[in-house]
Amino acid sequence: MNEKVLKENTIETEDIAESTLPKLDKLGRAYATGRRKTSVSRVWIKHGSNKISVNGKPSKDYFKRKIYSTILEEPLFKTDNLDKLEVFSTVSGGGLSGQAGALRHGISRALVNFDPSLRKKLKKAGFLTRD
């Protein structure tokens, strides 16, 4: 009986290690999908300078209003990665506000795939929650 209790309460070390490893493709990029309202974004993150592109344009050109660019930069700013990572993304559906929210959600999820230790900070800020 003691062996049965011990087996039930034992955690496999492989399960723990797997959740702390980054999920990167062959090119060293982390990928995630973000959603808000009816907008859907696909986001890739890799090491590089502060460059955020949306549908092939710099984010400042795609979003004319500064508030939208600020919204999608929030996860990078919160995790001190604003000047360290490049973000490539596509977004479709909905309006500009929904698209900015979908990008923030996608960037947050990609950051967790890139560095799983950031999950707690992003979750606390509410960036990983889909609405």
Q: Which residues fall in each region the model found?
A:
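Structured, basic alpha/beta domains of bacterial-type, RNA-associated proteins
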Residues: 19-35, 41-92, 97, 101-131
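Intrinsically disordered, compositionally biased charged tails
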Residues: 1-27
